[in-house]
């Protein structure tokens, strides 16, 4: 049985929207580089120099035989660094980077990025830029199938998204609780409905993910469980959620991210599941890759947030990442 409760609009009203990056061009048609700064926090951190940088641009030919042919739109998450440089200075150096791109494969298709340009202002992000980085292709590329293997490719930076980490305390992406299951527990999930502003056309993404310009995604917070395998009622869990005083915001971690801050009282068990952190970050890059790619430059805002209480999936249920077929003894079977 699933129970759904609505959060009050005041919990996301202040920071629940993202401004768009609208393409503008030079007279010759080239895109003009732009930077967007997002601050999803409350601004109570004394040192506001920590920021997350997300680069966006064109993956294009780098054979030097003529004007480069653009293959697809891509991104490069640089991660968190500390600097007092202005956003415009960071953008200028990013556009001068010579970032090579190579298509490869592991369990999934991947893209390899490495930079050949000496760093100055972007030195705090040297780990990703100078050591190279590998990402799942679906997370950082619109259409990986358009990237050739027989022609050298480079990533030309056009846009930069900066997320200021202005909340006091440490941020946490609660990966450890995503698959945590417990018998007779109630799973506490958050269902977010966002509205995309502007034109939603087939050239920018899959229209099937939108209904009336709206899309939803769900994140897992944790489980409510009692001792001796007894279950809480949904109404009791609702009271616990109300006491948490959750505040929501949209940020730019990995493209688009949901930030949740607990301003009230959290149960000891749930607090332990979350690593005793009260500032949570859920990048759509890890939750919904297709929706995240569509939102890289789009204007969007939260229109509804709901608490979803569902029975935790029993531990008896096996988690299958895929279906494997074995032909042992000449018979096909599903493992």
From Swiss-Prot:
The lineage of its organism: Viruses, Riboviria, Orthornavirae, Negarnaviricota, Haploviricotina. GO terms for cellular component: viral envelope. Keywords: Viral envelope protein, Viral matrix protein, Virion. Disulfide bonds: none annotated. It comes from Canine distemper virus (strain Onderstepoort). It is found in: Virion. This is Matrix protein. Belongs to the morbillivirus/respirovirus/rubulavirus M protein family. The M protein has a crucial role in virus assembly and interacts with the RNP complex as well as with the viral membrane. The gene is M. GO terms for biological process: virion assembly. It comes from the Viruses. GO terms for molecular function: structural constituent of virion. InterPro entries: Matrix_C, Matrix_N, Matrix_Paramyxo_C, Matrix_Paramyxo_N.
């Amino acid at each position: 049985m699933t129970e759904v409760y609505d959060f009050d609009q005041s919990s996301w009203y202040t920071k629940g929207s993202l401004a768009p990056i609208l393409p503008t061009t030079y007279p010759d048609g080239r895109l003009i580089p732009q930077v967007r700064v997002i601050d999803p926090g409350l601004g109570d951190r004394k040192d506001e120099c920590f920021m997350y940088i997300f680069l966006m641009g064109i993956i294009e030919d780098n054979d030097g035989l003529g004007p480069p042919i653009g293959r697809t739109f891509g991104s490069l998450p640089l991660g968190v660094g500390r600097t007092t440089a202005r956003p415009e200075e960071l953008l200028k150096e990013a556009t001068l980077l010579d970032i090579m791109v190579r298509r490869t494969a592991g369990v999934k298709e991947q893209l390899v990025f490495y930079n050949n340009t000496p760093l100055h202002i972007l030195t705090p992000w040297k780990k990703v830029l100078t050591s190279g980085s590998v990402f799942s292709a679906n997370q950082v590329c619109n259409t990986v199938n358009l990237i050739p293997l027989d022609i050298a490719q480079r990533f030309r930076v056009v846009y930069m998204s900066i997320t200021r980490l202005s909340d006091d305390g440490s941020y946490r992406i609660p990966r450890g609780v995503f698959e945590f299951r417990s018998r007779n527990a109630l799973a506490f999930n958050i269902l977010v409905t966002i509205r995309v502003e502007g034109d939603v056309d087939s050239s920018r993404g899959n229209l099937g993910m939108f209904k009336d310009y709206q899309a939803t995604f769900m994140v897992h917070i944790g489980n409510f469980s009692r001792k001796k395998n007894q279950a809480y009622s949904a109404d009791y869990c609702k009271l616990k959620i109300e006491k948490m005083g959750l505040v929501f915001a949209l940020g730019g971690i990995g493209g688009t991210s949901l930030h949740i801050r607990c301003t009230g009282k959290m149960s000891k068990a749930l607090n332990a599941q979350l690593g005793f952190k009260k500032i949570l970050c859920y990048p759509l890059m890890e939750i919904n890759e297709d929706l995240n790619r569509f939102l890289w430059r789009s204007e969007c805002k939260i229109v509804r947030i709901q608490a979803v209480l569902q029975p935790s999936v029993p531990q008896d249920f096996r988690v299958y990442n895929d279906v494997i077929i074995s032909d042992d003894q000449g018979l096909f079977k599903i493992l």
